[in-house]
Amino acid sequence: MTAFAYIGAALAEIAGCFAFWAWLRMDKSVWWVVPGIASLALFAYLLTLVEADHAGRTYAAYGGVYIAAALLWLWAVEGAKPDRWDLIGAAVCLGGAAIILFGPRGG
């Protein structure tokens, strides 16, 4: 469930932020903000579904997933292919997220 919550949250957050980007930077209608706000609310809800004891750890691990998802958005939606440095950076971030999520915790 955690992986699906993180992936869904990342897509919802990026879509919500992109709606504001489209309105403010691409001269789209202010009505783009309406689904953007709904998407950002969905993002916040989905993060509550992550199986973790502490919100801060959930958010920290989510950061790596967000970075990887943002690069997929860059490619799939904006048509700009990530370069090797983007991919290396995303791999490092996902590694960090895995350490945060799966690292042994003292009692």
Swiss-Prot record:
Membrane topology (UniProt): Multi-pass membrane protein
Secretion signal, residue range per the UniProt entry: none
KW Transmembrane helix (keyword) present: yes
Compartments, as annotated in UniProt: Cell inner membrane
Protein's name according to its UniProt entry: UPF0060 membrane protein Sala_0701
Species this protein is from: Sphingopyxis alaskensis (strain DSM 13593 / LMG 18877 / RB2256) (Sphingomonas alaskensis)
Top-rank lineage group of the source organism: Bacteria
Keywords, alphabetical: Cell inner membrane, Cell membrane, Membrane, Transmembrane, Transmembrane helix
Pfam families linked: UPF0060
Regions crossing the membrane: 4-24, 30-50, 60-80, 87-107
InterPro entries named among the record's database cross-references: UPF0060
UniProt record similarity statement: Belongs to the UPF0060 family.
GO CC, alphabetical: plasma membrane
